[in-house]
Amino acid sequence: RRQRDAAVAAGASGIEVDRWIAERFTLPKVDLPTLEGETARFAATMLRSLWGLGSRPLPNLIQLAEFRGIRVNGLPEVAASVDAYSTWYEGFPHVFLARRKTPERARFDLAHEIGHLVLHRHRGPGSRAEEEREADAFASEFLMPAESVVEYLPPNPTIDEILRVKRAFAVSAMALTYTVHKLGRMTDWIYRTTCTALSQRGFRGGEPDGMVSYERSRVFPQILASSKLGVVTGKRIALELRIPVEDVRAAMLDAELHAVPDGPGQRLVDRVRQSAPDRTGRRPVRSGARAEGLRPV
């Protein structure tokens, strides 16, 4: 309970950091449809189509989400029991990631939360367990489209083939094996023996020879590298928002540890706003009433 409360508080801090940035810089507009009522796998296929992704393996998922207007923040160590959660807040989609397991797991967690954002924006009294299954199914199809799995892998693939393709899709070997079996491309017996063999090779709790690092944000390094507003640091933002600097750094996915954005690509922070709006009299999101909408998913 304490760690869940810490995750909610960290989410509130993340929203404050995002608001501070949005008041001073122009960020990508939200391009995330509501696909409630659709099946999870159809929604994943539809979102890929709307975003022009085809069925190919996805690039850096954090940067893809940022480009489509999703605000992606990190969670601090005190929220260790929460892998990720998401919420819509004042018209903006937010995802909060712990990133304490493997980078492949973090990608799946982010895809899972995008599934919640498009499928469960207006939640009713439905089954939370069913929503979790739907978000998992969305993430699987979004990261590993059936069309591509069939193209890349033969029926009943070998472990070496699984490992080769899982690197191409930047997913865990176990997740890919499960997907292949779920698609009817692997017999029950081979599925069990493959999972056993992968477990013996360390793939149950980790990802040997996997991604070398977590995917990085493009937005936060660009904010920190900007000189038009003077030197921008996590400490400065923390002082202006009156929140702990550790919360700011976690919210910014530890971007201060990296001097430059992660590789070439389109600049997401287009320009500095001419003036930041007056915050006087605005009740901060950290207040109890404003934070009620934040719930770990």
Residue ranges and their predicted role:
Residues 1-297:
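Short juxta-domain linker segments that transition from a proline/glycine-rich
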